[in-house]
């Protein structure tokens, strides 16, 4: 059944009637709901059900299994908290995972004092991994379950944001500075740390987000939103082709997230 318009369940639970009686469901039933972004979740029963005309059965509540954890970072720490457990008195009792960047000093080849100034921490690979960037010129990909550093580069000056791209490649937004690699969006391959495969100019680059539906990379910096498509992506020399630049009403763009396949949130 497809309703004539999407049903808004963000504020409260909603009852969705489905008319199928009379019917015998000898093996029970499964009800699957799909949201406007294509995420599906189900509720059901294995008990047999017989409905005569006019009868009804109410299923259990169907709840999305989308992650309700909040990830935030600053200084040398990354924290993951259960948003359902946190309250106005604090978050510490709700911490489910944390990472201290100084523990990766040897892997990064940096002094512990440079494993600091974290700017971005972004869950990727269905929440199994985490991309972390630092203004001290590095980016790392972590396995959340083990804390292992799966990829790192220290060639990303003033790295402010990163994003996973298809075929195990990573985009990094490198913000302002005097280095020739500042004010760029860089592309790396996970298997080849510290090797910049491609970079594109973007003044004060601060955010990168991949949209799987549109197959486009969105990047922000200064007063610009730049939209890239992938070019020669499976070759040894991939690149980002600038497709469009959108000037935003105000400058100083600092952060961006993908709300859904049709909506970006930019701050």
Task: List each language-model region with its residue ranges.
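Short, solvent-exposed loop/turn segments at conserved positions within beta-propeller repeat blades
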Residues: 133-135, 175-183
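Repeated scaffold domains used in trafficking and secretory/extracellular systems
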Residues: 110-122, 156-165, 202-210, 248-259
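Tryptophan-paired
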Residues: 1-51
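Short loop/turn segments immediately following beta-strands, especially the blade-tip
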Residues: 82-89, 229-237
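Surface-exposed loop and turn segments in beta-propeller and other repeat-based domains
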Residues: 92-114, 239-252
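Short loop/turn segments that connect beta-strands within beta-propeller blades
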Residues: 84, 144-146, 188-193, 231-233
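Residue-level detector of Asp-centered blade-edge/turn motifs that repeat once per structural unit
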Residues: 64-66, 124-127, 164-167, 212-214, ...
């Amino acid at each position: 059944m497809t309703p004539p318009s999407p049903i808004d369940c963000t504020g409260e639970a909603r009852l969705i009637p489905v008319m199928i009686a009379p019917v015998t469901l000898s093996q029970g039933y499964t009800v699957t709901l799909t949201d406007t972004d294509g995420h599906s979740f189900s509720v059901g029963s294995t008990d047999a059900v017989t409905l005569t005309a006019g009868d009804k059965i109410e299923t259990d509540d169907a709840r999305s299994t989308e992650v309700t954890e909040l990830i935030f970072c600053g200084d040398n720490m990354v924290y993951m908290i259960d948003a359902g457990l946190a309250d106005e008195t604090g978050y510490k009792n709700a911490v489910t995972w944390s990472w201290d960047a100084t523990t990766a000093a040897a892997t990064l080849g940096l002094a512990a004092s440079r494993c600091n100034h974290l700017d971005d921490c972004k869950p990727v690979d269905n929440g199994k991994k985490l991309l972390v960037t630092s203004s001290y010129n590095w980016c790392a990909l972590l396995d959340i379950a083990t804390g292992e550093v799966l990829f790192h580069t220290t060639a990303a000056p003033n790295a402010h944001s990163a994003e996973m791209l298809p075929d195990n490649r990573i985009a990094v937004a490198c913000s302002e500075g005097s280095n020739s690699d500042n004010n760029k969006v860089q592309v790396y391959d996970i298997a080849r740390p510290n090797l910049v495969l491609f970079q594109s100019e973007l003044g004060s680059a601060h955010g990168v987000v991949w949209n799987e539906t549109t197959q486009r990379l969105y990047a922000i910096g200064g007063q610009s939103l730049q939209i890239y498509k992938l070019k020669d992506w499976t070759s040894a020399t991939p690149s980002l082709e600038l497709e469009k630049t959108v000037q935003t009403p105000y400058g100083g763009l600092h952060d961006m997230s993908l709300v859904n396949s049709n909506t970006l949130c930019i701050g």
